[in-house]
Amino acid sequence: MKTLYSLRRFYPVETLFNGTLALAGRDQETTGFAWWAGNARLINLSGKLLGAHVAHAGLIVFWAGAMNLFEVAHFVPEKPMYEQGFILLPHLATLGWGVGPGGEVIDTFPYFVSGVLHLISSAVLGFGGIYHALLGPETLEESFPFFGYVWKDRNKMTTILGIHLILLGIGAFLLVFKALSFGGVYDTWAPGGGDVRKITNLTLSPSVLFGYLLKSPFGGEGWIVSVDDLEDIIGGHVWLGSICILGGIWHILTKPFAWARRALVWSGEAYLSYSLGALSVFGFIACCFVWFNNTAYPSEFYGPTGPEASQAQAFTFLVRDQRLGANVGSAQGPTGLGKYLMRSPTGEVIFGGETMRFWDLRAPWLEPLRGPNGLDLSRLKKDIQPWQERRSAEYMTHAPLGSLNSVGGVATEINAVNYVSPRSWLATSHFVLGFFLFVGHLWHAGRARAAAAGFEKGIDRDFEPVLSMTPLN
């Protein structure tokens, strides 16, 4: 068996099937990895690895385009998006495409265009992936040195990191330009129940924006998830885009410092573990963001948050009973606390009953009824608008608590609709994926560190139990 430099620590298992899997430099004999180890076979074949990554991007973009068109084909304008199981159209609507006042969809053509553009892009990526996987050079170092690399080349690795950071920064600025110049984005806080608007007065104050990072993650603080106006969100993207681009330029122009060279493991598997760790953190943050935040993820498209649906129920019954003559300011509930209104731990007037635990909810249909000391009794008696009643009644029956068999809403709510909120799907999927990515991070980090330390030798084949067993054939 040829012993390559990369094979020093591999002791491949011989199986009955090895002879049939000669894949020209991608078989177990020459790489130390069996076919099921996926891209591990391509660790030293930069051209083939490029093909795998481009083809993977093609699959992702194809799914986005096809699913986008599937949702457009199934779209019913009479029902809210969140009642139709959509997970892509809400994102397009949040960007201001195809929607008008109150989040009403007035034109589905932009959604169709988005789907078609993604399908066309996926065809280009798919062709590129197949080309590089089957026809292109196996390694890029000789023919295209700019695109070639050696995993241990620290300077080249930080250059690649820098290019990635610049691309991420450009992505952040695309959102900024959309909000500033290209038609604006959907603002759930626009007066009268939300509308598309251009963001003109960006928040660029570092004390405000970086103050979010210093907040507690609990309760009414809510870390960065507590952001509740688009000026802060778009201004934050200006800062993030700038930091990413400047950091990218920095990493392209500089070499890693001595402390970084010593502290980090410099191998392909180590970079994989770093990436998985970062994606895991993104997944957990996205989970919290989509579950709690109704500014970046407007309730008109994603359905109400859990606290929002609960507060909407309290509001709906306050409106009903007030019309029937109840004195909502003083009525007592079964525990002796206020039935409709009570005071929070810090003295604000809040909704009473079980929803008291969600007293720090902020929602655009409720904020106009607050005064300096919480809910304003005179506004509750005189200023409630029909759109606020309609929206809270809708949200009350669409709590994001559905189970997988589509029994939506609160179990005791007889008016609930059979549906699973996209908020539930997006939060749950990002939590689960974030968890698995974290496990993958630990796994690959452990392997990479062991390999770097020189004790990843595998099982001693001389004493392997299988050698004393009867052959399968």
Curated annotation (Swiss-Prot):
Compartments reported by the entry: Plastid, Chloroplast thylakoid membrane
Phosphothreonine: modified positions: T15
Main location: plastid
Sequence similarity: Belongs to the PsbB/PsbC family. PsbC subfamily.
Residue numbers bearing the N-acetylthreonine modification: T15
Bilayer topology term: Multi-pass membrane protein
HAMAP family on file: PSII_PsbC_CP43 (MF_01496)
Protein known as: Photosystem II CP43 reaction center protein
Cofactor remark from the record: Binds multiple chlorophylls and provides some of the ligands for the Ca-4Mn-5O cluster of the oxygen-evolving complex. It may also provide a ligand for a Cl- that is required for oxygen evolution. PSII binds additional chlorophylls, carotenoids and specific lipids.
Domain of life of the source: Eukaryota
Membrane-spanning segments: 69-93, 134-155, 178-200, 255-275, 291-312, 447-471
GO biological process, one term: photosynthetic electron transport in photosystem II
A GO CC term attached to the entry: photosystem II
Gene encoding the protein: psbC
InterPro entries for the chain: PS_antenna-like (IPR000932), PS_II_antenna-like_sf (IPR036001), PSII_PsbC (IPR005869), PSII_PsbC_sf (IPR044900)
Summary of subunit composition and partner proteins: PSII is composed of 1 copy each of membrane proteins PsbA, PsbB, PsbC, PsbD, PsbE, PsbF, PsbH, PsbI, PsbJ, PsbK, PsbL, PsbM, PsbT, PsbX, PsbY, PsbZ, Psb30/Ycf12, at least 3 peripheral proteins of the oxygen-evolving complex and a large number of cofactors. It forms dimeric complexes.
Pro-sequence residue ranges: 1-14
Protein keywords: Acetylation, Chlorophyll, Chloroplast, Chromophore, Manganese, Membrane, Metal-binding, Phosphoprotein, Photosynthesis, Photosystem II, Plastid, Thylakoid, Transmembrane, Transmembrane helix
Binding site for [CaMn4O5] cluster: E367
Function: One of the components of the core complex of photosystem II (PSII). It binds chlorophyll and helps catalyze the primary light-induced photochemical processes of PSII. PSII is a light-driven water:plastoquinone oxidoreductase, using light energy to abstract electrons from H(2)O, generating O(2) and a proton gradient subsequently used for ATP formation.
Gene Ontology MF terms in the entry: chlorophyll binding; electron transporter, transferring electrons within the cyclic electron transport pathway of photosynthesis activity; metal ion binding
